C-alpha cells in the first residue's frame, strides 16, 4: 500500500495540468500534495470488507440492511407504515468527473421489503422510474410525494402490483437539475401536519382536498429534521446544524419586515470533525485550514442530512442527540443538544478514541442521509462512491486525484446500514398500516418518534371524520400522563379540524378538580401547542384569548410562552387582537425577539399599530425597546412603499406623534432605515405620487415626488432584442439555480447566501 500511495502521489504531481474546472477561482493557486505523502488506496470494497472499516462506540453495532443489486446510488430512505423502505436513487449523479450524462432519466424510486423479518431487505420493486436526479420522498395519503426535478409528484399504486399507476403533478418549476445540492429537497413531515422542504421559502400542506404551497422561511442545503417539540433543524456544507426556534411560517409572514428573529439559528460552534482516515480527496484540500497536519478534514465541508434521533434502538444516551452526515470526511458526527431558555445549543460528542460517532477508513463510504426506523434504530444511506463532489464545484486539485486514483468508477453501488444497540436482539419493528383507531391513538405515547409521527399522520389522513378518533384524542390531550403524547394529540386534532374550546380552555373553578390540560397545562410544551392549535378560536372567543394573555403576563420558565402568544396574536386580525398585542408590548418591548414576533404578525397593519401607540397615554412615556418598536413599524411601512400608508405615516409624524419627540424621532429613524437602495447600495428616495400636504423637515430627505428639485427620476429605455434575450436567459438560470439560495426577493438567507438586491457587486459598473 505504501508503494502504491507513493506512486499515486507522484502521479498527482507529475500529471499534465488539468483543464480549468467550474470550481476553480480565478487567480487562486492550488498547491499539489507533497511528493512524499502516502495516500492510501481506495478500492471498491464488498459489503463485508466495508463493514470492517467502521468504528462506532462500544455498545453500538452497525448492520447491513441492503446493498447492490437491491439498491443503487441511494440518496434518501424513509420507512412506510408497514415497515417497508422507500429509497430514492439518484443514479444519474456524476457519471464521471465532468458529469456527462447527468440529466439522463435513469433515476428511480425503489420499494424494499423485508419478507422474512430478519432485518435485511429481500425484495426490490421499482415503483417509479425514468426520473432525472430525484431527491426526496414521503409516504402520505396512500401513495408517496416525490421530488423529481423540476416537479413535485404524487404517485400511487392503484392495482396492487407495487408499481405507480397514477402520477399527478403537484407542483412544477422547482429547479434541481442544474445544481442538485442547491435545490428543493427533504419533504419532512412536521408536527403541525405539513411537509417541510429544505432550500426553498415554502412548504406543502394538504388543504381543500389538494396540495398547496405555504410560505415559510428558507433554510438548509440538503436534508432536514425535527425534535420532539417540532423545531426544525437544517444545515449547510460548512455549518453542521441550525435550528428554527419558532415556526418559519410565523417568521416569513410579513415581507415588509423580512424574516422574524428565531429562525436559521446556529446551534454548533465547533465545526471540526474527527475522521478515521486522511481526507486529501476533499475538493479544496489545498486551501489553508481545510486539512490538518495529519491530512484529515479540519472543518466540515460536506455536512448534510441532519437527524435528531428520537428512537430507543441505539440507546437511551443517544436519544435526542443530533447526528450529521459528513460524506467528504467519511463519517457521521454526533452532537448533544441542550435547551438554554429556548435557545438550542449543541456540543460534539466524541468516542473514547477521539473519533466521531461513526467513522470509516474506506474513502468510498459516503453517508448522505439518515432516518429513524420503526424499530427505533438509526438508518444510514451510504451512496458508496469515490467521487461525491458535483461538477459545478469540482476543482482542478480534485479532478487530478479522481483520475489518478480511479475514484470516478465504479458507480451504481450503494448500501443502507442500521445502527443499533449491541445489547440484545434487534427490537421488533412497529407496524401501523393495519392498526385500528385505538391502537393509533395509543401509539402517540410510544417512546419512538417514528411511531408517534406515523400514528399522527395516519390519524389525520385516514380518520379525520371518525368520532371515535376525535373522542379518544380529546381524552389523551386532557388526561395522558405523557406531555409529548398530549402534544401529539393536540396537533392530530388540529390536523383533523377537531380543536374545540373545551379542549384548550379550562374554567377557573375546574382547575381545582381535574388535570387542567390545554392552555393551562402544567407542562410548557403542551401550553405552547395549545396556544398554537387554538389560533382559529381566539379571533372569535374572548375566553381563549384571555387564557393566552394569562400565560403571557405570567410566563414563568423564560419568555417562550410570551413569544408564542405574541406570534399567535398575529393570527388574530381583529381590533381586540391588536389591542392585546399592544398591551403586552407595554411591558415586553425591551426584548428584541418579542418585538420581532409581534411585527411578524402585523403585515399590512403596521400603521394601525403606530396609530394605537400614538393614541395611548401609556405609550407617551419612553421605555426600554419602545423607540425600537416604533422604528421597526415605520421601517415596514416605508419598505412596503404603498402610497396611502406612506401618506398616513407622514401625517402621523406631523400630527399625533409630533408633540412626543422621542416617538417622532423613532418614526423618522425607521423611515430612513426603510429607504430603498441604489445600484451602489446607498439609500435613495421613497417615491410618492404627489407632494404631501405637510412634510416634517426631518423626513424631507426620505421622500421624493414629481417635480421635487434634485430628485428627478432616471429615464428607463426599453431593452433591445439582444438585451431582452439575455434577460430571459438570465431569468431562467436564476429561477432554476440562484433562487434556491438568494430567494426570489434577492434578499438572500442568513448563514447561507448574501443579498443580491441592491448589491453593488450586482448593479455596480465594475
Regions found by a protein language model. Give the residues of each.
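Sequence/structural segment immediately N-terminal to covalent heme-attachment motifs in c-type
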Residues: 723-747, 763-766
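Beta-propeller domains with acidic blade repeats across secreted/periplasmic ectodomains
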Residues: 21-440, 450, 458-461
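Long, ordered, helix-rich scaffold segments
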Residues: 381, 406-412, 419-733
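Gly/Gly-Pro-rich "capping" loops immediately C-terminal to redox-active cysteine motifs
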Residues: 402-404, 479, 748-766
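Bacterial N-terminal signal peptides
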Residues: 5-15
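Positively charged n-region of N-terminal signal peptides that target proteins for export
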Residues: 1-3
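C-type cytochrome heme c attachment motif
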Residues: 305, 377, 415, 492, ...
Amino acid at each position: 500500500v505504501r508503494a502504491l500511495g507513493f506512486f499515486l502521489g507522484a502521479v498527482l504531481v507529475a500529471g499534465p495540468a488539468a483543464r480549468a474546472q467550474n470550481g476553480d477561482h480565478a487567480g487562486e493557486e492550488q498547491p499539489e500534495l507533497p511528493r512524499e505523502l502516502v495516500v492510501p488506496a481506495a478500492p471498491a470494497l464488498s459489503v463485508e470488507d466495508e463493514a470492517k472499516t467502521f468504528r462506532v462506540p462500544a455498545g453500538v453495532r452497525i448492520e447491513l440492511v441492503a446493498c447492490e443489486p437491491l439498491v443503487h446510488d441511494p440518496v434518501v430512505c424513509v420507512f412506510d407504515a408497514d415497515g417497508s423502505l422507500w429509497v430514492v436513487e439518484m443514479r444519474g449523479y456524476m457519471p464521471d468527473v465532468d458529469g456527462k450524462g447527468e440529466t439522463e432519466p435513469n433515476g428511480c424510486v425503489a420499494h424494499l421489503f423485508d419478507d422474512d423479518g430478519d432485518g435485511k431487505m429481500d425484495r426490490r420493486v421499482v415503483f417509479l422510474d425514468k426520473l432525472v436526479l430525484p431527491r426526496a420522498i414521503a409516504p402520505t395519503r396512500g401513495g408517496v410525494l416525490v421530488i423529481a426535478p423540476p416537479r413535485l409528484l404524487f404517485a400511487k399504486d392503484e392495482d396492487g402490483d407495487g408499481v405507480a399507476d397514477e402520477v399527478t403533478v403537484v407542483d412544477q418549476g422547482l429547479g434541481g437539475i442544474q445544481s442538485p445540492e442547491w435545490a428543493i429537497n427533504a419533504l419532512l413531515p412536521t408536527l403541525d401536519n405539513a411537509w417541510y422542504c429544505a432550500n426553498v421559502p415554502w412548504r406543502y400542506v394538504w388543504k381543500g382536498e389538494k396540495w398547496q404551497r405555504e410560505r415559510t422561511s428558507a433554510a438548509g442545503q440538503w436534508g432536514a429534521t425535527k425534535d420532539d417539540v417540532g423545531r426544525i433543524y437544517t444545515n449547510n456544507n460548512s455549518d453542521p446544524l441550525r435550528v428554527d426556534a419558532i415556526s418559519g411560517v410565523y417568521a416569513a409572514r410579513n415581507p415588509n419586515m423580512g424574516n422574524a428573529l428565531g429562525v436559521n439559528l446556529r446551534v454548533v460552534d465547533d465545526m471540526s470533525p474527527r475522521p478515521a482516515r486522511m481526507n486529501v480527496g476533499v475538493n479544496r484540500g489545498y486551501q489553508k485550514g481545510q486539512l490538518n497536519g495529519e491530512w484529515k478534514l479540519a472543518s466540515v465541508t460536506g455536512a448534510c442530512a441532519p437527524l435528531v434521533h428520537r428512537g430507543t434502538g441505539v440507546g437511551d444516551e443517544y436519544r435526542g442527540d443530533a447526528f450529521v452526515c459528513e460524506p467528504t470526511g467519511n463519517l457521521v458526527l454526533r452532537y448533544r443538544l441542550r435547551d438554554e431558555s429556548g435557545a438550542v445549543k449543541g456540543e460534539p460528542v466524541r468516542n473514547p478514541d477521539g473519533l466521531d460517532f461513526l467513522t470509516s477508513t474506506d474513502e468510498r463510504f459516503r453517508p448522505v442521509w439518515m432516518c429513524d426506523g420503526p424499530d427505533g434504530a438509526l438508518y444510514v444511506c451510504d451512496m458508496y462512491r469515490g467521487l461525491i463532489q458535483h461538477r459545478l464545484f469540482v476543482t482542478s486539485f480534485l479532478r487530478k486525484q479522481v483520475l489518478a486514483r480511479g475514484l470516478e468508477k465504479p458507480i451504481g453501488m450503494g448500501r443502507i446500514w442500521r445502527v443499533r444497540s449491541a445489547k440484545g436482539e434487534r427490537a421488533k419493528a412497529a407496524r401501523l398500516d393495519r392498526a385500528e383507531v385505538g391502537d393509533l391513538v395509543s401509539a402517540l405515547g410510544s417512546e419512538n418518534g417514528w411511531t408517534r409521527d406515523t400514528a399522527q399522520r395516519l390519524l389525520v389522513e385516514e380518520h379525520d371524520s371518525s368520532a371515535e378518533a376525535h373522542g379518544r384524542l380529546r381524552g389523551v390531550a386532557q388526561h395522558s400522563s405523557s406531555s409529548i403524547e398530549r402534544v401529539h394529540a393536540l396537533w392530530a386534532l388540529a390536523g383533523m379540524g377537531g380543536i374545540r374550546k373545551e379542549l384548550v380552555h379550562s374554567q377557573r373553578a375546574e382547575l381545582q378538580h381535574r388535570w387542567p390540560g390545554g392552555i393551562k397545562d402544567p407542562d410548557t410544551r403542551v401550553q405552547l401547542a395549545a396556544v398554537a392549535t387554538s389560533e382559529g378560536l381566539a379571533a372569535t372567543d374572548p375566553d381563549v384569548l384571555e387564557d393566552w394573555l394569562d400565560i403571557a403576563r405570567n410566563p414563568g420558565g423564560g419568555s417562550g410562552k410570551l413569544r408564542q402568544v405574541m406570534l399567535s396574536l398575529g393570527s388574530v386580525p381583529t381590533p381586540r387582537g391588536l389591542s392585546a398585542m399592544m398591551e403586552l408590548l407595554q411591558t415586553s418591548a425591551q426584548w428584541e425577539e418579542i418585538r420581532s414576533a409581534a411585527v411578524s404578525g402585523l403585515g399590512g397593519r403596521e400603521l394601525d399599530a403606530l396609530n394605537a401607540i400614538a393614541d395611548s397615554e401609556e405609550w407617551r412615556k419612553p421605555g426600554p425597546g419602545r423607540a425600537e418598536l416604533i422604528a421597526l413599524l415605520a421601517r415596514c411601512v416605508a419598505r412596503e412603499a404603498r402610497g396611502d400608508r406612506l401618506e398616513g405615516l407622514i401625517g402621523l409624524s406631523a400630527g399625533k406623534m409630533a408633540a412626543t419627540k422621542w416617538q417622532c424621532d423613532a418614526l423618522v429613524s425607521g423611515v430612513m432605515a426603510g429607504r430603498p437602495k441604489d445600484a451602489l447600495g446607498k439609500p435613495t428616495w421613497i417615491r410618492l405620487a404627489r407632494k404631501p400636504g405637510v412634510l416634517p423637515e426631518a423626513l424631507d430627505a426620505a421622500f421624493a415626488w414629481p417635480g421635487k428639485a434634485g430628485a428627478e427620476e432616471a429615464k428607463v429605455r426599453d431593452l433591445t432584442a439582444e438585451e431582452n434575450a439575455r434577460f430571459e436567459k438570465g431569468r431562467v438560470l436564476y429561477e432554476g439555480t440562484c433562487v434556491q439560495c438568494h430567494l426570489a426577493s434577492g434578499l438572500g438567507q442568513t448563514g447561507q447566501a448574501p443579498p443580491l438586491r441592491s448589491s453593488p457587486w450586482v448593479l455596480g459598473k465594475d
